[in-house]
Amino acid sequence: MKTPTLLRLACLALLPLAAQAELSNDSMIGPGLRWRPAYDGAASQKTELVPVIRYLGLPWFVRSTQGVLEAGVRTELGTGLHAGAQIAYEPGRLSGDSDFLRSHNMPDLKRSGSLGLQVEWDHKFGPVPVTLLARGRKHFDSARGLQMDLRASAGVFQSGPVSAGVFGQAVWANGRATNSYYGITPTQSVVAGLPAYEAGSGLLNTSFGLLWSVDLGPKWLVVGNLERRQVRGDARNSPLVERTSNNSASAGLAYRF
């Protein structure tokens, strides 16, 4: 679906509004499937098992529903305003998932984690629920650098058991973070047969998408999303980027608790 068409549909859907931004803040847990690119900018796609989890307590929280699998502590600063610290899972980049990386003998970036801080604001503008989330993350491996993201989401539709929302997100990275994913050292250049490339700091990627859920009963629901992501900044010009835009989708069965 082209971007203008998706935006027109989102605007039309504002007539009946969902109850909560990011569909809900209900506690839930369950299994899911995700279809995604091998890495942002890859032509190869892969399907993987992912958790569907959300528990927003005080002080503890854990969730996978805001684009990152994260857990930590948070505190309430005011009505609808929370600040916290988190540990997050960082998926890395595996050459075996990408025909391009494998054919050029590019090394893996191992799965890792990060430490960070976040601020989140939930508010209703009339009947429209909105969530704004800002996060900063520093990889455990100092060579993997720092990232910051800003995410906005809103509920836009509810009819019977079906709810939907939209979201947009932008991610910035310092030079180490961008270069670790998209840079090519002179040594790697010789092995891979690709030109050496050094990526700098700045905007890394932007994305927008659709969130949806279907209630199956008081305790069970199906949740999912559709996402379109674009590689930006220095990363966009890397020889490792086969496509500047990627699509992903996920769906899962969750139990409310």
Describe the role of every protein-language-model region.
Residues 1-26, 42:
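Cleavable N-terminal export/targeting peptides
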